[in-house]
Structures are given as structure tokens and as C-alpha cells.
Amino acid sequence: MALSVEKTAAGREYKVKDMSLADFGRLELELAEVEMPGLMSCRTEFGPSQPFKGARITGSLHMTIQTGVLIETLTALGAEVRWCSCNIFSTQDHAAAAIARDSCAVFAWKGETLQEYWWCTERALDWGPDGGPDLIVDDGGDATLLIHEGVKAEEEYKKSGAIPDPASTDNAEFQIVLSIIRDGLKSDPMKYHKMKDRLVGVSEETTTGVKRLYQMQQNGTLLFPAINVNDSVTKSKFDNLYGCRHSLPDGLMRATDVMIAGKVALIAGYGDVGKGCAAAMKQAGARVIVTEIDPICALQATMEGLQVLPLEDVVSEVDIFVTTTGNKDIIMVSDMRKMKNNAIVCNIGHFDNEIDMLGLETYPGVKRITIKPQTDRWVFPDTGRGIIILAEGRLMNLGCATGHPSFVMSCSFTNQVIAQLELWNEKSSGKYEKKVYVLPKHLDEKVAALHLGKLGAKLTKLSKDQADYISVPVEGPYKPAHYRY
């Protein structure tokens, strides 16, 4: 696709695959709104006061129908918004078209190259010559990363005149990042400093991005305040767990039509995502094996009737492999060569480095057969056996299906709206330093409460005497910060 910005009749910038899909996208947005009570409650509660009036928000988060409802909640509260996806395969093109036509600048389409992906990220951050966004909604930390790397390069350029050299790294994706920063230096050597100086803060959606933020905080390199949305209970214990329980089998069946019952499934990692994936496979009738490094998580898995074994002990027995760890080098090409014919290998962690795709792509004589988009059979020349890789080792539930359902994403995205409001409302108070924060317990409970009515649930009320007996306020919060749900 030619990388040039287009404009709507109203003058709004965009780059999407097909604007003729906008009406279809609008119909699905209207369906999703009914399933997203938390976001709709935010519109009702905060819309009249327009708390985001004057705020610029950049989003780097999967451009799906559910994200469209989030975007239109932010604009309903007064924000100006520019958006890109955080994964090359996760955009739903009808959602991107509807939002680009009706609501905000969107730069996203399904099946981006890495070059296109980072171009879209740069466009979403580009608010013109007077700096970037006030706030960032990030998922995986790529928008945050680009600003940090840009500031670092500008400081080096100012000090020594050195410009980023893409050849200085073997990582093909980071070469693209350095090229973008290098080109930016030529037009404005303070471009990313201007962004950094304007930024109020970022709210981060997922485990991988949160890890990046805590690493920067530990190293003293974090440039602006950050709210860790991922570790809100109403995000990690719902989106990560129940969302993956729903979307993993959806992606598997859309991609392969595989019969899960009777198969052996291996789930690498037994955190919240792994728990949801293991539950889905077990409920579908698979025999589930878990790999784990953490003895506590391993013990939890055994208490659920799951086997816990190292990958190398069972690699030749497994039919379906799912990586969920957020770590790298979980399944290597040496493991793939030992797998049974047509074993399915997929990842539901954020990045594509859990499965050794580079090792597979460069294996001598390996043959790639594309069955359909995001479903490839790779055949090893020496064994004649093939394995099926989904979404090129990237997020399979969004690459091969449509991700998590609207209701569970309403929990996550309501946390995002609240986090963005918190950062914006406190921008001049000094409350938030260049550190990583989590939302307080009473807001977590509020997000949960907003979703109960839709499910027909009613809470029991404490009396004052009962509340005093267990030392909590009648109106909550009901659990201490350290409570493990």
C-alpha cells in the first residue's frame, strides 16, 4: 500500500484499507455498544462536562470494533484522537473505516508490513509542528518506545552530531524504528523532545507493555507518568482470563477447523492468559499439558487436573501448542522439527518472539505453504513433516479471529477511560511523577459494578454494623490492595 495520508470530506486524516466498509463497521459498532455498558456509562456520566476538551489523545491499540467504541467514548468526552493499531494483523478493516469516516484520524489496516506499521505509529503521534499528544493509550508500549528512542537519538545528535544507524542492529524491526527516527532528525532535530515535553502521561493496556514501563522506571529512563491498566483486577482477571478462554478456540477453529476434543494441547505459561487458554482447551475436550517456571503457578495447574511438564519431554506428543508467556524463545525451530506432522503452533502473547519464526524462516530448505491468510504450513525437507503456524507467530486470536468479545473488553476499556481521565485531571497537581502507577481499588470496584446490571446481577448490601465488624466502609472498597482475587 502506498504510504500517503488521505483526507475525508471533512478534512480528517486517515489511511485505511477500504472506506466503503464504513457502513458495515457502523452497524457492528452499534451492536457492540449494547455489550459495553462500562463505556456507555462513562459517556452518560462524563459526557455533559466534556472533561477531555482540549486534550489530544494518541492510541496505539488493536483497531477493532470494540476499540472503536472506546475511541468514540473518548471523543464523546471531548478529546481529539489519532489512532493506529499495535499489531500488523489485528485491525478489523470495517472498524477502521467507520471510525476514520465518523470520529477520528485512523492509520491502520489488516496485514501491514513492519514498515507500514511503524509509519502508522508515527502518523498517530504526529499532531503537527507544536508537539505531539497530551495522552497516550498504549498496548504493548510501541508508541511509548518510539518517543523514548527518539528522545535518546536527539540527545546523542545534539551532543555529538551522530545520527541513528539502522545497520547498528541485527533486529529488522528496530532497523525500521531507527530509520524513522533518523528521517525525523533531518526535518526537526527536537521532534521527540517536543512530544515528551507536552505529554501528560500514558496508560498501558497489556502485560508486555507494562514490563517495558517497569524496566524504564527501574533504569531511571521513564520520561513521563504511566498508569498500569493491565494490573487492574477488572482487566487482568477478566480480559486476560475470560477473554482468552473465549478467543483462543475461536481463532483455532477459524484458522484450521480442528477438532479440539481428544487432542493433546500444550499451554506454555500459566498466568492469567495461560489459565484462560488451558480452561478453554480442557472444556473443549483436550488433554492439557502446561509448561511453567513458577512453582506457584505450576501447583495451581496441577490442582486443576493439568499435567505440568517441560516442553522437551512432550514435544513429539502434542497436537496444539499455544504460547502465552510474554517471554522470548519459548518454542525454537529445534523443537518444531520434533513435532508430529501437522501440529498446530500458535501464540497469544503480545509479540512475535515467543515462537522462533526467524529460525524457521531461515531453516535450510524449509517450504512455506500458505493455506489461507495467517494460516501457513511449513514443511521440513529432512523429515517431510509439516507444522501449521498461525498468524506468523503473532497474536492468533486477533490475526485469525476477532479477538475478545465486546463485554469483557468493556471492562478493560473502562479502565482505560478512567486512567486517561485521572492523568488529565491531575496534570497540574504534581500527583503523578515519572513512575508507573495502578488505579486505586475503589475505581476497580466501580468498573466491576458498572457491568453487573447487564448480567442481571445484584449486590448484597452491608449494614453499618457488618461493615464495622470487618473494618471496611459500607460503600467499599471491600478488599485491601494486596488481596489476590
From Swiss-Prot:
<feature type="binding site">
    <location>
        <position position="240"/>
    </location>
    <ligand>
        <name>NAD(+)</name>
    </ligand>
</feature>
<protein>
    <recommendedName>
        <fullName>Adenosylhomocysteinase</fullName>
        <ecNumber>3.13.2.1</ecNumber>
    </recommendedName>
</protein>
<dbReference type="GO" id="GO:0005829">
    <property type="term" value="C:cytosol"/>
</dbReference>
<feature type="binding site">
    <location>
        <position position="327"/>
    </location>
    <ligand>
        <name>NAD(+)</name>
    </ligand>
</feature>
<dbReference type="InterPro" id="IPR042172">
    <property type="entry name" value="Adenosylhomocyst_ase-like_sf"/>
</dbReference>
<feature type="binding site">
    <location>
        <position position="139"/>
    </location>
    <ligand>
        <name>substrate</name>
    </ligand>
</feature>
<keyword id="KW-0520">NAD</keyword>
<feature type="binding site">
    <location>
        <begin position="269"/>
        <end position="274"/>
    </location>
    <ligand>
        <name>NAD(+)</name>
    </ligand>
</feature>
<dbReference type="InterPro" id="IPR020082">
    <property type="entry name" value="S-Ado-L-homoCys_hydrolase_CS"/>
</dbReference>
<dbReference type="InterPro" id="IPR036291">
    <property type="entry name" value="NAD(P)-bd_dom_sf"/>
</dbReference>
<comment type="subunit">
    <text>Homotetramer.</text>
</comment>
<dbReference type="GO" id="GO:0033353">
    <property type="term" value="P:S-adenosylmethionine cycle"/>
</dbReference>
<dbReference type="InterPro" id="IPR015878">
    <property type="entry name" value="Ado_hCys_hydrolase_NAD-bd"/>
</dbReference>
<comment type="pathway">
    <text>Amino-acid biosynthesis; L-homocysteine biosynthesis; L-homocysteine from S-adenosyl-L-homocysteine: step 1/1.</text>
</comment>
<feature type="binding site">
    <location>
        <begin position="206"/>
        <end position="208"/>
    </location>
    <ligand>
        <name>NAD(+)</name>
    </ligand>
</feature>
<dbReference type="Pfam" id="PF00670">
    <property type="entry name" value="AdoHcyase_NAD"/>
</dbReference>
<keyword id="KW-0378">Hydrolase</keyword>
<feature type="binding site">
    <location>
        <position position="64"/>
    </location>
    <ligand>
        <name>substrate</name>
    </ligand>
</feature>
<feature type="binding site">
    <location>
        <begin position="348"/>
        <end position="350"/>
    </location>
    <ligand>
        <name>NAD(+)</name>
    </ligand>
</feature>
<keyword id="KW-0554">One-carbon metabolism</keyword>
<feature type="binding site">
    <location>
        <position position="292"/>
    </location>
    <ligand>
        <name>NAD(+)</name>
    </ligand>
</feature>
<feature type="binding site">
    <location>
        <position position="397"/>
    </location>
    <ligand>
        <name>NAD(+)</name>
    </ligand>
</feature>
<comment type="function">
    <text>Adenosylhomocysteine is a competitive inhibitor of S-adenosyl-L-methionine-dependent methyl transferase reactions; therefore adenosylhomocysteinase may play a key role in the control of methylations via regulation of the intracellular concentration of adenosylhomocysteine.</text>
</comment>
<comment type="similarity">
    <text>Belongs to the adenosylhomocysteinase family.</text>
</comment>
<dbReference type="GO" id="GO:0004013">
    <property type="term" value="F:adenosylhomocysteinase activity"/>
</dbReference>
<feature type="binding site">
    <location>
        <position position="235"/>
    </location>
    <ligand>
        <name>substrate</name>
    </ligand>
</feature>
<feature type="binding site">
    <location>
        <position position="239"/>
    </location>
    <ligand>
        <name>substrate</name>
    </ligand>
</feature>
<dbReference type="Pfam" id="PF05221">
    <property type="entry name" value="AdoHcyase"/>
</dbReference>
<feature type="binding site">
    <location>
        <position position="205"/>
    </location>
    <ligand>
        <name>substrate</name>
    </ligand>
</feature>
<dbReference type="InterPro" id="IPR000043">
    <property type="entry name" value="Adenosylhomocysteinase-like"/>
</dbReference>
<dbReference type="GO" id="GO:0006730">
    <property type="term" value="P:one-carbon metabolic process"/>
</dbReference>
